[in-house]
């Protein structure tokens, strides 16, 4: 049992190892920190009578967000005597994820299982917001592209890929819609949504959403309607492409007459474009430079500030899709990618090469 002010939390467990049980104080404090953060962010006090948790041996999931009795897997809560920073981060993220579900999934529940992904994308997004500042020495952008982007691309490149939101006519088939797209592409989309409208406006919308639909049901479109009123951006159009359509764009780069042309194509020929932002690194004889690209249409033309030898797409890993460099850059990149000093850029370029290989 752990008390902080008027709040009391109880833990139930089978573990008897004193060294592992000594971790309970850290676990309790992380639960409390997640509760405080979510209350402050949402403006909504913890919405249920209690927050107790049960640490189960051999539990098949990392956690399960039952109100008043959250379930956790013992191996993910009781760590080894000398855990790595990544193991500690995963535990913090798990606690934050399940705690976020108290607001997103329990306080407001999806109307039907075709929107089951919404509670997962909220939990993943807010778990990152809570956890990442606590581990400043970890490259979180690198982790995001290794986890979310790489995993979702592995499915999105295949003929069997699906949209994030999928129709479900019978509850017995609900298990079929879980996978890389729900758990990994949805967070990619959410990060882009927040980037598009701005963090402050997003937070305003989240507060209105929770207050409007507390202790009831809501759809993703209900949220988008609220968020759409907070910004001049067309979030309905953004959502239709990123949430309702399957697949990923093919983005080609060419250089001509001192200009960079970026062409976005839909492999399914539906005439849609995926709005997104990413960095392009320009490599010249004397210097390099980074361009911030805001891709909103099928064709984007940008002036090059100096003579450029190589154009490296998506070097910050924020972009999503199959990035095809110009014919001069691709063979050079294949021979020199490992020389890139920045870890995030090196991973993003390696993933670019891998996706180009898979597309052959």
Please identify what each model-predicted range represents.
Residues 180, 256, 270-272, 304-360:
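Long, ordered, helix-rich scaffold segments
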């Amino acid at each position: 049992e752990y008390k902080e002010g008027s709040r009391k939390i109880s833990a139930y467990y089978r573990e008897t190892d004193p060294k592992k049980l000594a971790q309970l104080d850290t676990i309790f404090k992380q639960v409390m920190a997640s509760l405080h953060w979510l209350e402050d962010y949402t403006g909504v006090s913890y919405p249920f009578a209690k927050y107790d948790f049960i640490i189960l041996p051999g539990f098949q999931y990392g956690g399960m967000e039952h109100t008043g009795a959250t379930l956790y897997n013992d191996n993910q809560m009781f760590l080894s005597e000398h855990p790595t920073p990544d193991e500690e981060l995963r535990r913090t993220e798990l606690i934050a994820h399940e705690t976020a579900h108290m607001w997103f999934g329990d306080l407001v529940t999806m109307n039907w299982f075709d929107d089951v992904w919404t509670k997962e994308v909220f939990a993943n997004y807010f778990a990152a917001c809570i956890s990442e500042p606590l581990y400043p020495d970890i490259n979180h952008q690198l982790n995001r592209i290794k986890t979310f982007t790489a995993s979702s691309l592995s499915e999105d490149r295949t003929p069997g890929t699906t949209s994030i939101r999928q129709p479900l006519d019978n509850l017995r088939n609900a298990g079929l819609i879980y996978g890389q797209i729900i758990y990994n592409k949805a967070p990619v989309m959410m990060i882009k949504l927040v980037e598009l409208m701005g963090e402050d406006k997003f937070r305003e919308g989240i507060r209105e959403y929770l207050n409007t639909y507390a202790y009831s049901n809501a759809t993703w479109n209900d949220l988008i309607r609220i968020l759409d009123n907070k910004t001049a951006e067309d979030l309905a159009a953004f959502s239709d492409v990123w949430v309702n359509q399957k697949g990923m764009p093919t983005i080609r780069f060419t250089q001509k007459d001192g200009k960079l042309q970026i062409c976005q194509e839909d492999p399914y020929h539906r005439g849609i474009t995926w709005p997104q932002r990413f960095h392009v690194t320009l490599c010249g004889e004397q210097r390099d430079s980074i361009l911030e690209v805001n891709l909103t249409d099928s064709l984007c033309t940008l002036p090059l500030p100096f003579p450029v030898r190589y154009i490296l797409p998506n070097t910050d890993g924020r972009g999503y899709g199959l990035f095809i460099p110009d014919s001069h850059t691709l063979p050079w990149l294949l021979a020199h990618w490992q020389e890139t000093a920045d870890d995030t850029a090196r991973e993003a370029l390696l993933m670019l090469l891998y996706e180009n290989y898979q597309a052959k």
